[in-house]
């Protein structure tokens, strides 16, 4: 696994390797997304960063801080409740109106929920945040990701390595819901989807990452101010700062350790590997295979037997077919 020193060495080299970079951060106005966007602004000489979030005040604050850290960058906030797929579509329209290519799509929305809460689109809001809206961003922005000269990357921050069994007729949790199912299904759907996507779009790499325990507003958002404060205090000895998380996630987003399955240019895989860091094994077991299930430190978190069993039963394609059918049903589109 890459050490923090190796992470920082790679991030320092990013500025020389890529003078410009276009990135979209869904959930970029707080927590891990905000921290990673800030690290990118520090590392890349002329970044273009789009932040997608619900809170305009938070968006304005982060934009000010990004401009202060790197005045040569271009920064944009898009207000959107991305628990709604129709809002995702509007946000993507704004991005595609402004950009011809995207190098990084970084998604970190969602929280831990103790109860089910359906949106007016008929999906559990947190399940939408953690899976459906993320995949809608991927689908809508794939032409821009594919247009990147490379390397282009999609990073889904959630629960890599925490997959489990699922009922094939309950992917959307409408048949039955529980706290455990909600977490397991979101993790498993993300991992299966990125395997499908890495095959369908082999010039883009896809990462599903468990970020570790990070000192962010997530605890308060999930359990309220009082409960969140207690949990944050208890977890402090084993948690990391947002700054360290941002550094690690910038590494995952840019290092050549996580290349696409079929790169456009084999010499442009990302920031060249620093000494002691090797090309990662994909969730399929293939080195450099394009779909990566990772721990916070960049090491492999794939549950190999479970994923192989899902693969043998064609679950990556089944999950993606279900995802597209859900988009059609919710959005009433062809």
Model-derived features: positions:
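NAD(P)H-dependent oxidoreductase Rossmann-fold/reductase module
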Residues: 1-78, 94, 169-334
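Conserved sequence/active-site signature of Rossmann-fold short-chain dehydrogenase/reductase
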Residues: 112, 162-163, 214-215
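Glycine-rich NAD(P)-binding loop of the Rossmann-fold in SDR/ketoreductase-type enzymes
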Residues: 83, 125-133, 185, 240
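A glycine-rich helix->loop->beta "capping" turn
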Residues: 71-76, 93-107, 113-118
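Short alpha-helical oligomerization interface
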Residues: 112-130, 175-176
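Active-site loop of short-chain dehydrogenase/reductase
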Residues: 101-102, 145-166, 202-204
């Amino acid at each position: 696994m890459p050490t923090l020193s190796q992470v920082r060495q790679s991030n320092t080299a990013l500025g020389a390797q890529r003078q410009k970079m276009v990135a979209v951060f869904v959930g970029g106005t707080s927590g891990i997304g905000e921290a990673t966007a800030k690290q990118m602004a520090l590392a890349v000489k002329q970044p273009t960063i789009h932040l997608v979030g619900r809170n305009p005040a938070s968006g304005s604050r982060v934009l000010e801080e990004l401009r202060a850290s790197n005045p040569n960058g271009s920064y944009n906030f898009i207000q959107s409740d991305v628990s709604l797929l129709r809002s995702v579509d509007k946000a993507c329209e704004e991005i595609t109106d402004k950009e011809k290519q995207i190098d990084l799509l970084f998604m970190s929305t969602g929280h831990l929920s103790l109860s089910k809460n359906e949106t007016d689109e008929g999906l559990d809001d947190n399940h939408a945040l953690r899976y459906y809206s993320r995949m809608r961003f991927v689908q809508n922005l794939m032409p821009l990701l594919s247009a990147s000269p490379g390397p282009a990357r999609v990073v889904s921050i959630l629960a890599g390595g925490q997959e489990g069994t699922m009922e094939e007729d309950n992917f959307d949790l409408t048949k039955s819901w529980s706290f455990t199912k909600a977490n397991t299904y979101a993790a498993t759907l993300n991992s299966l989807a990125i395997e499908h996507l890495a095959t369908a779009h082999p010039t883009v790499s896809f990462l599903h990452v468990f970020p570790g325990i990070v000192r962010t507003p997530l605890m308060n958002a999930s359990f309220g101010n009082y409960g969140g404060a207690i949990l944050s205090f208890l977890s402090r000895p084993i948690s990391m700062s947002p700054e360290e998380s941002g550094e690690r996630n910038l590494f995952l987003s840019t290092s050549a350790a996580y290349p696409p399955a079929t790169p456009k240019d084999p010499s442009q895989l990302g920031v060249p590997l620093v000494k002691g860091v090797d090309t990662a094994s994909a969730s399929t077991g293939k080195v450099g295979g394009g779909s990566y299930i990772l721990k916070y430190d960049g090491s492999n978190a794939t549950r190999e037997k479970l994923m192989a069993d899902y693969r043998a039963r064609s679950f990556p394609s089944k999950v993606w077919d279900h995802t597209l059918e859900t988009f059609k049903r919710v959005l009433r589109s062809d």
